[in-house]
Amino acid sequence: MKRLVFILLLSLTGFAVHAQSTFTVGDGSFLLDGKPFAIRAAEVHYPRIPQPYWEQRIRMCKALGMNALCIYIFWNVHEQREGEFDFTGGNDIRAFVRLAQKHGLYVIVRPGPYVCAEWEMGGLPWWLLKKRDIRLREQDSYFMERLERFERKVGEQLADLTIDKGGPIIMVQVENEYGSYGEDKAYVAAVRDVIRRSDFDRVQLFQCDWSSNFTKNGLDDLLWTMNFGTGANIDDEFRRLGELRPHSPKMCSEFWSGWFDEWGRPHETRDSHLMVDGLREMMDKGISFSLYMTHGGTNWSHWAGANTPG
């Protein structure tokens, strides 16, 4: 752990969030106010942290040397009953993002609709299944109408906190690892358009996936980022991206620091040295990353989700 803190602190620079800054994609790098910027993000999930501990966890992420937080927005947390939205208390995503800004951290928002995250139904509300013929994560009219209604509510909470408006939000994700599920580019494009109509039309949009999946669902007008874990050959992971987009910034949007436990199986562990070595290599090469997870938190109530049907 001391090794990890030391390495991350080496990259620590002043990251106060300034009013009306710019965050753009340059030739091979991200640009913050026109200058090269490497993202060092901590993935944390606000529903897995009691609200009284939010600020303390955020401060711990910054103490690691992180300059950003990466957060999913969980649809089924905020709309547990159809048409009834809750962004209060432990669901107050605006307050969470404001706390990040208070401590000089940027924010990457990932509003789904599907988030995976080993969460109940991947973040999709249970009540969608009351319509027996619904097609989830497709251009099903019922699904898309309710998806847009939710994303507009997210926009009401967060759209005025993007970096061009003086807030800390630098990027917003479209869908989540969709190439592992389907190949419907038209659906991904429809979700992108919903995000833009939710007032995220001036912030950088991106999609994440495994390196083998972008030819299935990658959109030309979105930034592409990779997901992989400790022990991966980092050059190999980015090789295909380099072939498809040689001038794109490199970012591992989920650098898996560990793995989830499954019921009845031994506790999963990973070699911390491999994680540290991977982080060091990415920092040495100017590759941006989000450490997934930096703080795992706790699955309260019934929110833990299954990854397999068995």
Predicted feature descriptions by range:
Residues G34, C61, L69, A100, ...:
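Conserved, mostly hydrophobic/aromatic
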Residues G83-N91, Q101-K102, P113-E138, R152, ...:
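Aromatic- and acidic-residue-enriched segments that line the glycan-binding/catalytic groove
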Residues V5-G14:
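Bacterial N-terminal signal peptides
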Residues Q101, L105, R197-S198, R202, ...:
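Catalytic-core region of carbohydrate-active enzymes that cleave or remodel glycosidic bonds
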Residues I39-P50, F74-D92, L129-R149, Q173-D184, ...:
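The substrate-binding groove and active-site-proximal loops of carbohydrate-active enzymes
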Residues W54-E120, R192-V203:
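Aromatic-lined substrate-binding rim segments of carbohydrate-active enzymes
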Residues L4, V17-A68, R98, K102-G104:
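N-terminal carbohydrate-binding accessory modules
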Residues Y142-D221:
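Active-site neighborhood of glycoside hydrolase catalytic domains
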